[in-house]
Amino acid sequence: MKQRQARLIGTPSQTRRQQELAEKLEKVKEVLEDEKKRQFNEPLFDLTKLRQALDKAIPQPEDVKGFFAQIIKSPSRYEIIFDEAMGVADIEEQEVIEKLRAKEEDEVYDFANNFVRQRRPLPQFFKTFFDKETEKDIFGDIDDISDDENSFTNQDGEAEDNEIITGIRQKDKPEETKEIKLIEQVNMNEGIGRGKILGNKPVFRSVQKSKPFIAEREELKAREGRKRRIQPIPFGIFKEEKLKTCLQFYKLFPWIKDQVLDVFVAPISSNFDDSFFIRSDFYEYISSPVGFAITDDEVEKFYRPKEKYYKLQCYGINKYYNENEPEIIHVNWNNQEYLFKIGILTENRGFLIQEADILLAEEDFIENWLGKSDKRREELLNSVNIPSDAKAVARNEILRSLLNVIPNADLLYTNRILTNIVEKIVDLSLNTSDFFLRVADLIVFINPNINFVSSVFPKRLAKMQYKPEILPLLTQREKLPEIFDDNRIPEATIEYVNRTIHFQIEKVYEDLVNYTVMYNVIPTRKATRPFQMGGKVKPTGRDDKIIIGLPEWKNACVNVNDVINIPDEDLIFYSDIEDQNSDVYCFPINELLDKFSREDIHNQYTGKDFSDTFVRRFLSVYSKPIQAERVVEVERVEEDNIPEGPLIKLIKAELLRLENNLIEPEYFQEEEIKCLECKKAVPAGEGMLSIFKGKKVAFCNMECFENKKW
């Protein structure tokens, strides 16, 4: 392959594109080869991991940031990559690229490596990067996590932001401690700590007012180049109303620049019981340096935590690590000290055991969150342009409400339909606050916290009798006809329903805002559903259903005998709006759709035509019911028409190969096996067998096994 590449490069007619293709093919082969060398405790073939690896091996830049990602892989080619990036860059970005051409290769690489890990525009990041030093580690810049990377509308006011970052909200502190602001810490291992390794415990509020502590702090303030505060935030400050947010922090670990797939805990102290963990669901961590366990002592079980564990994390105080036990965290809660290990399963780094450095990042992140959540909320609600995060949360919450009343809602209301509904609400909204209010109004009527004798709105939604784009425009009367369309309902009942619905809309509105602020602060992953602890969760403030007795809906119709066997959701009331004393008639929706499609607007019961207002509104609101089977069939046809790209073809070919070897994988087939140490053939049934890096290996005897340098 190397000779082939050399020949290609030496050929004058060989284009740069062919050169890159050869490099990419080589990377794909390396990815597939690495997949075969995976650890034995991983699945035989992980399609998701292969897809992610191949996506990284074959980047397809659509903007400037994609080209900077290429520079990280091939720093020496940055001039060529810059030429290609100029084709997609705007004027300001082109100016930055021209300035970068004058930099050294190492500087360009450092800039690219930092630029792709944050979300600021290229011109702004260029100024920030070369105007001042920034501190980076495996957790990223905390400013990127909590401010620049996630702000909704403005990226200005850097001095104000830094003041918020280095401080903490003082309103809950006693008056005498408000003047004490948290400042950043320099690296030190003695005297004053912030939750890292100190031999025992970090300094918390109990010593904040002591003279030695204040003197040390003032001395550190004067030092140049200070980038870290010296005092960690006190834990246990999450109040009950913020518990939902805190629980998600310890599930998602947003202070880690990687996607967290799962969290497991290994209890150390004896005060843990089964209320903290699911004992039947565990992860076996092998601590042996050779990659596999020889004894049972080298296998440690980490259990899946329950909600009580997350409350321990939220309400616990005095978190610290001891120097002689760097993996065991100490947390005080309810006058007890809990000792445990935290295992974090990540997408790119595998299984990590939390140590003090992750606790530091956690403290930084939570301090910034507490200091900026109010500001972030205000910016969000006042934004005239609806942020994409707000749209995503609205789409997910609408779907969740539909799923609560329609089991197959995800089949009926596809992502395209939900997006159209949300975009229609965006068009009607004045700002983000108004947008959330309209979304909340729709959600509450989809699944109202009132149990009627017959709730027709969700039933019509299940049959898709409404045109999707009309849903944001429906009136209360159209969404709750059994209340507002029946003249027999007492006025007191209507008032009570209005008050109840108004209260529910306010609660859902708050949930939407909180979800969006939470959604926006996670830079490394975007959830497909709102953040929950799993299972169906009641929205805030929505208790047991309020039961209201209603009269039989059809009894209000003069023609009740003609529609007695038709479900309520398939009927619509009609009365002459010009005649207040007009009788009420019930008509099947499908019957009127067929009738109006033939331009027949004659009312057979009154001998008059339906009013023009009624006909226009009816045709704009209702459509023919659709069956779930039809939706599935349409979706399948649409999927079949999608052309297969090279990545899909490669994955299919690999899957076919794996299917052919499914019963007896290739590296477990019976064949001559040689000793891993002396390379002599080991006859079948003799010697010692083991597993090393996912492959079956053999040794002639114990001597070869002991001599092998793992």
From Swiss-Prot:
Alphabetically sorted, this entry's keywords are:
Coiled coil
- Region annotation (Disordered) ranges: 1-20
Query: By what name is this protein known?
Result: Uncharacterized protein 268L
According to its UniProt record, which protein family does this protein belong to? Belongs to the IIV-6 268L family.
- Regions annotated as coiled coil: 13-42
Q: Which domain of life is it from?
A: Viruses
Q: Does the keyword Coiled coil apply?
A: yes
- Source species, please? Invertebrate iridescent virus 6
